[in-house]
Structure formats: C-alpha cells, structure tokens
UniProtKB/Swiss-Prot annotation:
Hydrolase recorded as keyword: yes
Site (Has an effect on thermostability) location in chain: 318
Record's keyword annotation contains Hydrolase: yes
Active site: 466 (proton donor), 534 (nucleophile)
Species for this entry: Leuconostoc lactis
InterPro entries, sorted: Bact_Beta-galactosidase (IPR050347), Beta-gal/glucu_dom_sf (IPR036156), Galactose-bd-like_sf (IPR008979), Glyco_hydro_2 (IPR006101), Glyco_hydro_2_AS (IPR023232), Glyco_hydro_2_cat (IPR006103), Glyco_hydro_2_CS (IPR023230), Glyco_hydro_2_Ig-like (IPR006102)
EC number: 3.2.1.23
Protein known as: Beta-galactosidase large subunit
Keywords, ordered alphabetically: Glycosidase, Hydrolase, Plasmid
GO BP field: lactose catabolic process
Catalytic activities: Hydrolysis of terminal non-reducing beta-D-galactose residues in beta-D-galactosides
C-alpha cells in the first residue's frame, strides 16, 4: 500500500494500518523491572532531523527513502511543537477555524451529500508540513520480537514510513497511535520517517479553545512484544449493593502463542486476596473473583488494589509481567434523578484543565502533572474535566492515586462549524447528522474508552465539547452505553437540540448559566440532574460570585456542582530584550491574525503555575462540601 495525500481531504479516512486502541497497561520482563524500567520499551524522544514546508507542494516528496540525502535538514527536539521550535506561526484562537477570513472552507459533505473537495487540505496554501527522520538500531532484547511504534500524541495528520515502506496513517491528535513495524524492521540502521500535516479534515473537529500547534508533542516509543503478549486488559470491579463485598471480572486479549496466565490480586498492604490461572490465546477470561470486607475508592480514601498477571510459555518460562492498580466504586443515577457515588450524593468541586507549560506549550512533564495534583488537593478541587481532549497517559493513574474524579472527554470540538461570532448557525455543522462523519467521531470515542476504561477516577465519559448535536453524537453516546454501564455520559451541546435530550447525556449540562436560571430549571420538574460543565470564567479579577452557585448545593439535591473555567492560563514565556527578562505572552502577542487575544488567560493559576488570588475563593467555597 502507498500513502495517499488525498486522505487529508476525506473525513472517512482517519486511520490506515493503525492498530486497535487498547488498555493503557505496562508490561515488564519480570517484577524487578517495576523499579528499573521495562526492557520492552525504547524511547525515540530526543533529536530528530527535520524539514519544514509552508505547503504540501513544497514538502520533500521522497524523504522517506533510505538513500535520501537529508544533509540540509535541521534538527528538532521530540516531543515538541513545530511552532515553538521557530517554524510557522504561533496562533491562539477560541472558536473560529485558523483559516477564517483568509480561505473559504466548508467541511466535506455538508453543503452537498456528494461533495468531496479535492485539494481542500492536500493542495492548500496554509497547510504547513513537518518531515521528521530518525535512525535507530534494535537492542538485543528486541531482535526477533514483534515491534510496535507508539506515538502518544501528534497534531494533526500523521504519515509513517520505515526503511522506505509505508507503515500507516492516523489523525486523532490526543490519543496514542500505534503501528506494526515488524515486516520491515532491521537489526541496525532503521530509518523512520514521519510526516505531519497541520491540517486535515480532522481540523474541523479539533477546534478547541487553545493555541493551534502542530508536530509530535508527546512521547514516541518502540515496543517489543514477547511471543505471547497481553495486548488488552479489561478490569470490571463491581461492588454489591451493600458496598461491603463485591466481585471482580477480568478479561484479557492475548496475541501470539497460547500462554498460561497466572493472576494475583493483593490489597494495599500487599496481602494476597485471590489468585488463579488460565491458559489460552485470543480472549482469555478469568473466573469471577469474590471479595469480602471491600475497600471502596473515593476522593476521601482512594483505595487501590494491586493486580499482577504473569505470562508463561509452554515451557513455563516467564515472558512478561503486567501490573495494574484498580478500585471498587459505584456511580448511579437513581430514580430521584440524583447522581450518587458509593451511595453518597455526588458534589463536583471541579476545574477544566488544559495541559500546559509556559515554556513548552502542551508538552508537559510528570513534574507538571504532579504539581497540578498537589494544587488541586491543596485547594479542595475534587474533579477535573480533561478539556477538551484525552490527556497524557500518566494523568489518569495520578488521579486514581490522589482521589480526583475525572470527566474523560473525547477529542471533539467543532465550534467553528455552527457558532459564528456568537450566533447559532448550524447549516454546515459537523458531525451533526451527516452520514460521512460518524465513523470518525465514534472512533475517537472508542479510543478514549479503550485506553482509559480501567481507571476508577473516571466517573463520566464526555462526548466532546461545543459541537452542537445530531445523530452522529447520539451514536457516540450509544457506543459508550453499549460498552460501559459503570459510568455516566456527559454532553453539553445537546442543550441546543432539545429533541435529542432523551438520547444524549445523562445530565443537564450548561455553560455559564446564571444561578437564577439554574433555580428555574431545578424547580420545574426536571428530568436530569444539573451540572455546570463550565462556569465562573476566571478571566481578570473574577470569581466574585462563587457563593451564589455554592448556595445551590444544600438547597437542591439535583444540583451537582460544576467545573470552573479554567485551571491554568495558556501563555508562553518570551524573552523581552528591553528588560532582559522572560515575560508571559498571551494570544495576539505573536503578531497572529486572527486571534482571540488575552482570552487565553482564564486560569486559577498563571501559566507558570503561580496561583491567582481567585484560588482563595475556590479553596474556601469548595472546602464547604468536601
């Protein structure tokens, strides 16, 4: 198969040869590697050769050939944003598309059901291209194994070649993309070529309120899979009605040769609670395990059990060990139309959190994530909405450990396709009811679900943000409901299409609703509990009216709190030659047009993670309903 540039123009082509999404578990050769690191993973982070082209027509066409002369290529650091490495244009936008006012574009199939626009992005004057090259050798432990490459985050359209052979294509910027390199891998001198286009039809559904970057911005790893390997792990802990006992069901997917799987579950103190062995390949399900004296996971006591599965071959040689921490908890929407977690009414003291670092943009470190967790705990914040995309893989485990509720949002926002300068005009909204778009958005829901399905901190799946509503989003809801009965589904955009409210979202979710309007809803025999998915917009000297929302919690059981907009400013440090100091620059400070200017600064913290005075209000009022 050959790569096709026209895939950029077609919303029905969003993954080619990409491996199916799966759980986010790690695997090791033995338990000693839990501390030293897995021998089965090799990082490709660091310096890559790089070429920047302003348009697809200017790209180095055959750069992926092993004999290509790349002496005139630059060097770029991976992970990193192309724009922050000095190429292209830094641009912050809230709702419009980056090309608005310059190039006329409509999403394919929205003006005519037979309309596919050739060259929409593949021959565009504004579609910048990054071409990356990396050479690597295989470590001895990798030789003879199945070899997978994992890109944890690439904006926006990704083509991959190895040693001159086309490997695959993907689009979803914020969930991992994996491809099988085995047919073309060499022991030495491998040439990995990656081409990243800033825009494809995915741009119509990745219109989030943020700086618009491109490039390989999360980790890149080579993974070796042993002869028998657990590719997916599905953990289903279910407390009984009394919450004092429960059962555990676990299903694995084993690729390669049939294997013996030895499972052990320990409590927090390391005591073995249950163990069993199963043999097979493909789908391998363990017998239901019963638990007495159950410890529940909650924000107050985020109790996690330790699962370990050892994989043995036919000669009883240990091939790999898979550890995973999991928790028991319930999430219920009861007949009284109130949400309960572990039989207690849910109160969300939440924030919306973009991933951000003032020096590196959305390239964030473990230190950044741990600092954010500590800030949340110190200020009585008990919930995070991953606005408006899936976060880096470690974030979900950190929230499990800290007791932070998660609303795990799917990578979907099409704001510019239906709301223009504040006016509602959905004539070319996507995904909408368009039969050419549901596969792409359901795939994004599937990726979000599969990667993060085992985390007790997730109590809501979110279908995305500000994308209006239609049959395609209803299909996303149906996907989550079909695959998971242990969580609720959230979506705010159905507010604009009340005829779909019975089929989309378990909660009445609104943005920036006035307290008196919330009261009017709650006193009018509502059908769903109320949740502010965004409120208390913290721009400038804000949050002065937080008490008016907080007072609703004690008066109305169906009022379940909300998520403040937002956690951290999006701003970048730039060296000021006049003062010889690094200063924070916001939207519009990079000579970009158009821009939504300082609207990028709505955080409870400045971009350097210094808390603003408003954080004192948050700590006080959120502390009233821990």
């Amino acid at each position: 198969m050959q790569a096709n540039l026209q895939w950029l123009d077609d919303p029905e082509v969003f993954r080619v040869n990409q491996l199916p999404a799966h759980s986010d578990h790690h695997y090791y050769h033995d338990t000693a590697e839990f501390k030293t690191g897995s021998r089965f993973i090799k990082s490709l982070n660091g310096a890559w050769r790089f070429n920047f082209a302003k348009t697809p027509a200017e790209r180095p066409v055959d750069f992926y050939q092993p004999d290509f002369d790349a002496t005139d290529f630059d060097t770029i650091q991976v992970p990193g944003h192309i724009e922050l490495a000095g190429y292209g244009q830094i641009q912050y936008i809230n709702t419009l598309y980056p090309w608005e006012g310059k190039i006329y574009r409509r999403p394919p199939y929205t003006l005519n059901q037979d309309q596919l626009t050739p060259g929409l992005f593949s021959d565009a004057a504004d579609n910048t291209v990054g071409s990356y090259l990396k050479t690597f050798d295989l470590d001895d432990v990798f030789k003879g194994q199945r070899i997978i490459i994992q890109f944890q985050g690439v904006e926006e359209a990704l083509y991959v070649w190895l040693n001159g052979h086309f490997i695959g294509y993907s689009e979803d910027s914020f969930t991992p993309s994996e491809f099988d390199l085995t047919p073309y891998i060499q022991d030495q001198g491998n040439v990995l070529a990656v081409r990243v286009y800033k825009h494809s039809t995915a741009a119509f559904i990745e219109d989030q309120d943020m700086f618009r970057f491109s490039g390989i911005f999360r980790d890149v790893n080579i993974l070796a899979e042993p002869a028998s390997h657990i590719t997916d792990l599905d953990i289903r802990p279910v407390p009984n009605a009394n919450l004092k006992s429960g059962e555990l069901n676990i299903t694995t997917k084993v690729t390669g040769e049939p294997a013996t799987l030895a499972l052990t579950v320990k409590d927090h103190d390391g005591r073995v609670l249950t163990s069993q062995t199963q043999t097979g390949s493909g789908s391998v399900t363990f017998d239901t395990m019963l638990f007495d004296q159950l410890h529940l996971w909650s924000p107050q006591t985020p109790y996690l059990y330790q699962l370990t599965i050892e994989v043995y071959d036919a000669d009883h040689q240990l091939l790999e060990v898979v550890p995973y921490q999991f928790g028991f908890r319930t999430v219920e929407l009861r007949d009284d139309k109130v949400i309960y977690v572990n039989n207690k009414r849910l109160v969300i003291n939440g924030v919306n959190r973009h991933e951000w670092n003032a020096h590196t943009g959305r390239v964030i470190s473990m230190a950044d994530m741990r600092a954010d967790i500590q800030t949340m705990l110190a200020n009585n914040i008990n919930a995070d909405r991953t606005c408006h995309y899936p976060d880096q893989l470690p974030w979900y485990q950190l929230c499990d450990e800290a007791g932070i509720y998660l609303m795990a949002e799917t990578n979907l926002e099409s704001h510019g396709s239906w709301q223009k300068m504040g006016a509602i005009e959905p004539s070319y909204n996507v995904p909408g009811d368009n039969p050419h778009w549901p596969a792409a958005v359901i795939d994004r829901a599937r990726s979000n679900y599969e990667w993060f399905k085992n985390h007790p901190s997730i109590i809501f799946w979110s279908l995305g943000n500000e994308s209006y509503a239609g049959e395609d989003i209803a299909a996303m809801q149906a996907f989550y409901k079909e695959h998971d009965d242990s969580r609720l589904v959230h979506y705010e955009g159905v507010f604009y299409t009340p005829e779909l409210k019975d089929r989309i979202s378990d909660v009445e979710s609104r943005m920036y609703e006035k307290p008196q309007n919330i009261v009017a809803y709650l006193e009018d025999n509502p059908t769903k509990p109320f949740l502010n998915c965004e409120y208390m917009h913290d721009m400038g000297n804000s949050l002065g009216g937080m008490q008016s929302y907080n007072d609703l919690i004690d008066k109305y059981p169906m009022y379940q709190g909300g998520f403040i907009w937002d956690f951290i400013d999006q701003a970048l440090f730039v060296h000021d030659p006049i003062t010889d100091q690094d200063v924070l620059r916001y939207g519009g400070d990079f000579d970009e047009r158009h821009s939504d200017y300082a609207f990028s600064g709505n955080g409870l913290m400045f971009a350097d993670r210094t808390p603003k005075p408003a954080m004192q209000e948050v700590k006080y009022y959120y502390g009233l309903h821990k």
